[in-house]
Amino acid sequence: MKKITKLIFTMLAISCMGAHAQETAEMVYPQAEWSKAGDILMHTPGQELFNGVIHPSAGLFENYFDVDIAAEEHRGYISMLEANGIRVHKVLDILREVGLDSLRQLATNVLKYDISSMPDEDAEKTENYRQEVLNKMSRNDLIRCILLQPTVKLSKTDNNTGYEAQYIQNPLMNLYFTRDQSITTPRGHIICNMNSNQRAPETEIINLCYEHLGLKPIMRITGEGRLEGGDYIPAGNISLIGCGMRTNDEGIRQMMEADAFGHDTIVVVRDHKLWQMQMHLDTHFNIIDKDLCTMVSSRLNAQPGAPEYNTCDIWARTPGTKEYKLWKQDQPFVEYIRGRGFQIIPIDINDEMHYANNFLTIAPRHIMAVGGQSEELQQRLREAGVNVEWIPLESLIDGYGAAHCMTQVLQREAYHPGVDPADVRSVNALTGESQSSYLLNGTMANENDRGVIIQNGKKVIRK
């Protein structure tokens, strides 16, 4: 694992088929959602996921899903990203490389011995015993400790060793949604303050990952402030930030006060519906290119006063100054987006419920999206010149998230406002037959492969 040692660096972008090297491009902290992605942070779920699926609602999930299949889907997604020349930094790989002292400190913070039912127990003796165990732990067991967050509830007994225990775990089953624990603005990385207490420890792991990569975060949201990465979208010379179920005004205020957005215009998109299925901005709005975006139909067609009707507040400052001032308030979000020159592709309800809107843009008019969407949506995307790589994520999406939620983009190509997407549009105007086909493990299928294939967004069986 190589550290990203400079804020701005260059890397050699490799074509999807690996056949031709393209020209060296400047990579920076993301300025625009549609710029070519270079580095992404991800976490393939493992044992920590199981506790979440045995009571999905309590785990912040939508339905039960198979842990092993979910992990295989995730590995397939990573393979598809890497096939596009993107460097994927994996949380587990980083934890296997960080300094042992840092890892042990993180484990020390989460391993608990509960002696509340033993009032006569010597607390100092218990703590010394806990430290002794931690000091003996192997690296892999320290990682297990960090991911499973165990508590040992002790009680006395006259049998055997004199102790017995209940073992309680609070595993980080949502860690694979690496979009949420932080956001990456043109200024750098901000560590979030999660809306859910059970997700709060995830931020410490992500913070450690950044430091190991040489990307020390510039700030952390604290106190009553709430901020989650799914609510943030960089859009060229503006920042879009959702305010609703998971992000609040105080979190946004802290960012503006710290000059953490890196843009002179901040658009606060207000969610009045507060619905779990649309918990973040990226679940009902997303950007494909500088003049093309998507929005779920219920938001796009909503009338003023309806819960689905999004409004936005626009904060601005004079370039070169720090203080933002409220410029416009309660503006219709759809009108604002169209006024900035965006064509909006509608996402109908059936596709929305299959997480069609939660795609990842990896280059102008080139997205990674959940397979199995309607032919109508696929046609709309083709007509707009969008190159879609359809990903099999049938299990993982039952965690209330998809391709965008599972990625934290660390670096993208530098944004150049003068680039016209017309050439990109003509290159990507693909027919249904020319869309790529993939095996279930995410590798590209060839004409000789048989069995279940993901082709044009749908599962087909080749005999």
Which residues does each predicted region cover?
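Bacterial Sec-dependent N-terminal signal peptides
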Residues: 1-23
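The feature marks the mature, well-folded catalytic cores of soluble enzymes
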Residues: 22-418
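Short, isolated positions in well-ordered beta-strands
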Residues: 239-240, 445, 460-461
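Short capping micro-motif at the N-terminus of alpha-helices
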Residues: 370, 406, 447, 462-463
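First exposed extracellular module after export/assembly in secreted or surface-exposed proteins
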Residues: 403, 432-433, 449
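Residue-level detector of functionally pivotal "anchor" positions at catalytic/ligand-binding pockets or at interdomain
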Residues: 419-443
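C-terminal tail/sorting-segment detector
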Residues: 420, 452-463
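Conserved beta-loop-beta connector loops within the AMP-binding
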Residues: 444-451
